[in-house]
Amino acid sequence: YSSAASDVYKRQAHNYSLLVGEIDLILREPDGTLVFCEVKTRQPDSLTTPAEAVTPAKQRRILRTAQLYLQHTNQSDQPMRFDVAEVTPLDSGRWMVHIIKGAFTA
């Protein structure tokens, strides 16, 4: 979550955790859409992409946690989306971030 992203997103929660699961970032877009974002990091030489680590079982846990978040915050009527942020370290010491919007659905 960088300062550039703060122009687009407003952070609602970070590492939101319940017994059923955890959501790395919960953000709100200017249009009101809630974005539940799973952040995954892999080394450049990994045989799998970061997004591939978000298995169907992990997706179910995120979905259930998101449902409970919406209930607890009285926001069940809000539009929402589930994104994955793929983070890969570069040789320069910087990071490459690729956002997959709508990576999975409820």
Explain the meaning of each model-derived region.
Residues 1-5, 9:
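Single conserved hydrophobic/aromatic residue that forms the stacking wall/gate
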Residues 4, 62, 82:
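Residue-level signal for inorganic ion chemistry
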Residues 10-14:
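A short linear hydrophobic-aromatic micro-motif
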Residues 19-21, 93:
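Short acidic/glycine-enriched loop/turn segments that link adjacent beta-strands
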Residues 21, 33-35, 83, 98:
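Protein kinase-like catalytic core scaffold
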Residues 23-46, 54, 62:
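Conserved catalytic cores of phosphodiester-cleaving nucleases, focusing on short active-site segments
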Residues 46-75:
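Mid-chain, well-packed structural core segment of small domains
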Residues 72-106:
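Domain-level recognition of nuclease-like catalytic cores that cleave nucleotide substrates
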